Structures are given as structure tokens and as C-alpha cells.
């Protein structure tokens, strides 16, 4: 037995060696294969979380009252959820949607970790000025857009961060605008204050002048009786509809050389300087629903002019276009003059001075006895270039008998030049 023991030991060692070589060959063969570059695990697992839960969702987090889509991990949607308070905002969130809720207060505690916020939408809530914690927005150093329209604000929210670019405060009850409210807002390009209670005393000369990058200012439906002073020269779009403005000072627009569109309809304008709108960049001008008795000089680059619902009895072409240039044509393409007191159509000479006109809308005119009359006229394009004629062959030149509402033309007006999309 002692003699066989060494032999058994040798056989055993040899067998073990062969088996190990075989097993090594099998595993080496498996791992020598080329890796699958298309392989992308659906989840990344962490030792401290439960299996089957996405790794990034647990790390980044989302308020339980809200929804954070996986394809937009930095956005949090809390809109239309009947919320009364703002939930705690996780640090990674950049876009916060809280519109259409019942929120009354904005507390600093909700934003204590929200250092990366770029856009906040708190529109259509019940927020009051006295229930906004002081400085809650100013601490958000990355904030670019703030929506607070359709709330119950009585005062301009102050202070605000320097990073802010778009501020929407329409449809509130704002009547107080502190002189230093705009201090530091050097990057704001769009400010909407329509449908508030602002008076002339709140818009002092230096209130808006420091906003050096402001391009769009909406002050429609307030309580203004005069043109706002101290507007920055960067302004391109100015909305002043539905106020009580009765006059425009001489040379008022000299400091606004970049102005592209001016809306000052539904005011009390009567007499304005003849060449007050002589601006080289002005494209759209709406002075409808005022008390103007005569037309004015039309600048060369103006394309859309709205004169409806005034007191104009006649339009002298030589007055609106004193020196036609056959080389550098005026750009006017659309003119609306309905609901005035015109007794006859504008002279056909207008098409020589404005060869690009596509249509003149006369609609109904008001007579001295209060009745309405319909002018019998057609719009001709005899001075247009041949290509323009070909493009419009299929259109009807006759405007007779058409009824055009303000809403219809306002919508068209916005389609032609959507202000907010240009900013």
C-alpha cells in the first residue's frame, strides 16, 4: 500500500493539471471575444439603492407633488395640481413649472437648494406681493425667465437677480413701481406690465433708462395719460394700447432709433406732430381707435399702418408721401382706414408713391349724421413688379363688402411679427 501511494499521487496531480488547463481555455475563449459596443445598460445600480430603480432619479430627486420626465431631467412640472404651497425644489432643477395652481405665497424655504434655476413659471396663481419673501428671487443667480402674470400682485417684485432676461408681470394689480426697482436689471430684454394699474407718476424718467438691453416693453391697459419718459435707446417694440394718452411730444422718438413696432391704439390722440413717426426702422404702426383728424408722414420702411376708428375725413397723398422716389420705393404694403369719415377713396396716386401696397381696407365709413357708408372701390396693383403680380393673381383685389374685425387683424398682426419670438 505504501508502494502504490506515490503512483496515485502522481496520477492525481497530472489529472488536476489537465483539468485546470481545460477550464482556463474555456474561460479565456469566452473573454477574448470583442466587446459589444452597442450595449448600454438600462439602469446603473448603486449599492445603497433598490434594484430596478433608475440611478439618476434617486440621486437627483423630484418633489412628490410634481413630475420630472426622464427625457428632461432638469425640468419639474407641478402645473394644474391644485397646489397651495411651493414644494421644495431639488438642486438640479433648471425649469420649474407651477402655473395654474392656488399658490398664495413664495417662501425662501422652497428655493433654499434651487441654485441652478433658469426659468420659473408661477403664472395663474393667487400670489400677493406681501406674501413674497424679501430677496427670494434675487438669490437665484442663474435665473433668466420669471413668469408672474395673472396673479394678485400690488407691487413690482423687488429685488431681482441681475441674470434676469425676461420678466412677465401682466394681468396683476401693480400700482407701485419703486424708483430703484429696475436697478441691476441690465440684462432684461423683455418686460411685460400690461393690464396693471400703473400711472404716470410711477414711470419716472430714470425708472426704465437703466435697462440698457431692453428690447420689448408692454405697458398696455394701464392708467397712463402721457408717453413714458426715459425709455432706453435699445427698445424695438413698444406697446401702449388702451391707456389715456392724448399727445406725443415733439422729437419723442429721437432717442428710440431702433424702434420696429409701435402700438398706441385705443388712446385719446388728437393732434400729433406731422413727422413724429419718421423713424428709419419702423415697420408696424397701430394708431387705430384714437381721435386723429388727419394723416401724417409715412416713413419709407413702414410696412403695416393701422388708422381705423379715427376722425379722418380725407387723406392727402402728397402729405403722407411728399417726395416719391422711383428708385427707393416706400415699403408700405397694408393700410387700414375703416371706421373713419372718408367720403371718397384715396387718390390712385397712392399706388405710385407706395407701389408695394397689396391692400387698402376701407370697410365702413361714418357719415356726419351718424350713418355708415360703404365706399365703392377696388385695390389695384398696377405699379407692382411682375413677379409680385404673378404671386397674387389668385387673390381677389376687391375689398368691397368685407367685414374685418379688430380681432381678425390683430391676430394677423401678431402672425406677421410675433414680438416675443424675436427677443
Curated annotation (Swiss-Prot):
Glycosylated; contains keratan sulfate. Keywords: Cell adhesion, Disulfide bond, Extracellular matrix, Glycoprotein, Leucine-rich repeat, Proteoglycan, Repeat, Secreted, Signal, Sulfation. Its main location: secreted. Glycans are attached at residues 113, 121, 187, 242, 278, 316. Residues 53-91 form the LRRNT domain. It comes from Mus musculus. SUPFAM superfamilies: L domain-like. It comes from the Eukaryota. PANTHER family: AGAP008170-PA, OSTEOMODULIN. InterPro entries: Leu-rich_rpt, Leu-rich_rpt_typical-subtyp, LRR_dom_sf, LRRNT, SLRP. LRR repeats lie at residues 92-113, 116-129, 142-164, 165-184, 187-207, 213-233, 234-255, 258-279, 281-294, 301-322, 331-353. This is Osteomodulin. The gene is Omd. It is found in: Secreted, Extracellular space, Extracellular matrix.
Amino acid at each position: 500500500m505504501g508502494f502504490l501511494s506515490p503512483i496515485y499521487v502522481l496520477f492525481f496531480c497530472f489529472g488536476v493539471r489537465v483539468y485546470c488547463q481545460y477550464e482556463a481555455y474555456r474561460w479565456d475563449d469566452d473573454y477574448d471575444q470583442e466587446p459589444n459596443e452597442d450595449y448600454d445598460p438600462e439602469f446603473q445600480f448603486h449599492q445603497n439603492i433598490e434594484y430596478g430603480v433608475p440611478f439618476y432619479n434617486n440621486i437627483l430627486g423630484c418633489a412628490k407633488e410634481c413630475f420630472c420626465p426622464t427625457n428632461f431631467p432638469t425640468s419639474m412640472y407641478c402645473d394644474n395640481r391644485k397646489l397651495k404651497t411651493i414644494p421644495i425644489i431639488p438642486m438640479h432643477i433648471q425649469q420649474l413649472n407651477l402655473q395654474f395652481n392656488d399658490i398664495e405665497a413664495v417662501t425662501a424655504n422652497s428655493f433654499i437648494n434651487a441654485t441652478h434655476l433658469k426659468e420659473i413659471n408661477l403664472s395663474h396663481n393667487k400670489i400677493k406681493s406681501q406674501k413674497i419673501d424679501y430677496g427670494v428671487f434675487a438669490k437665484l443667480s442663474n435665473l433668466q425667465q420669471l413668469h408672474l402674470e395673472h396673479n394678485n400682485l400690488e407691487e413690482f417684485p423687488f429685488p431681482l437677480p441681475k441674470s434676469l432676461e425676461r420678466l412677465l408681470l401682466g394681468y396683476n394689480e401693480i400700482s407701485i413701481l419703486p424708483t430703484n426697482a429696475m436697478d441691476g436689471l441690465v440684462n432684461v430684454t423683455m418686460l411685460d406690465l400690461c393690464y396693471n394699474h400703473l400711472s404716470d407718476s410711477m414711470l419716472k424718467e430714470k425708472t426704465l433708462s437703466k435697462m440698457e438691453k431692453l428690447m420689448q416693453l408692454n405697458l398696455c391697459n394701464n392708467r397712463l395719460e402721457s408717453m413714458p419718459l426715459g425709455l432706453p435707446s435699445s427698445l424695438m417694440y413698444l406697446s401702449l394700447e388702451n391707456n389715456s394718452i392724448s399727445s406725443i411730444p415733439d422729437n419723442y422718438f429721437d432717442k428710440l432709433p431702433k424702434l420696429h413696432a409701435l402700438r398706441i391704439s385705443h388712446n385719446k390722440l388728437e393732434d400729433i406732430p406731422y413727422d413724429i413717426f419718421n423713424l428709419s426702422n419702423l415697420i408696424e404702426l397701430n394708431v387705430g381707435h384714437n381721435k386723429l383728424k388727419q394723416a401724417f408722414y409715412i416713413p419709407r420702411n413702414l410696412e403695416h399702418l393701422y388708422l381705423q376708428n379715427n376722425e379722418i375725413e380725407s387723406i392727402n397723398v402728397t402729405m403722407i408721401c411728399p417726395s416719391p422716389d422711383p428708385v427707393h420705393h416706400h415699403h408700405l404694403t397694408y393700410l387700414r382706414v375703416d371706421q373713419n369719415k372718408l367720403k371718397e377713396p384715396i387718390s390712385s396716386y397712392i399706388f405710385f408713391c407706395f407701389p408695394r401696397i397689396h391692400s387698402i381696407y376701407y370697410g365702413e365709413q361714418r357719415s356726419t349724421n351718424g350713418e355708415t357708408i360703404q365706399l365703392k372701390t377696388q385695390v389695384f396693383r398696377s405699379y407692382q413688379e411682375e413677379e409680385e403680380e404673378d404671386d397674387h393673381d389668385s387673390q381677389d383685389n376687391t375689398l368691397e363688402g368685407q367685414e374685418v374685425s379688430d380681432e381678425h387683424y390683430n391676430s394677423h398682426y401678431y402672425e406677421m411679427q410675433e414680438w416675443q419670438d424675436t427677443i
